[in-house]
């Protein structure tokens, strides 16, 4: 089980203050995505919705954080197939075992328009949950 207090501290204090250090996060990613002129950007597992107001036409969802546009998980998100030009999955699709991750990827990819882009970041070497 994920320690919500620890996760909240991480996203509000550690991650937010270091986001600029990652090539595909922060302002570098904002400029790259906005240059594509997307009609819809989905931030899958947006946490505090860092990119809201920075990336045009962005909608974020997260199962926990109230800053998200939708409070839901990958399988409950209200998106139709092939609706998004860009999807961000920056650390949100690396929880669970290989089957869980594969199912999440299949679901999220189904929202991507042909020729769309998926920006993804996961835990190097995988992540072991309490389920395996």
Which residue ranges define each predicted feature?
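Class I (Rossmann-like) S-adenosyl-L-methionine-dependent methyltransferase catalytic domain
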Residues: 1-78, 99, 103, 117-132
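A short SAM/SAH-binding and catalytic strip from SAM-dependent methyltransferases
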Residues: 85-99
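A short glycine-rich, Lys/Arg-flanked "PGG" loop and its adjoining helix->strand segment in the class I
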Residues: 102-114
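A short acidic, Gly/Pro-enriched loop at the edge of an enzyme's catalytic core
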Residues: 76-87
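Hydrophobic aliphatic residue packing
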Residues: 41, 59, 87, 108-111
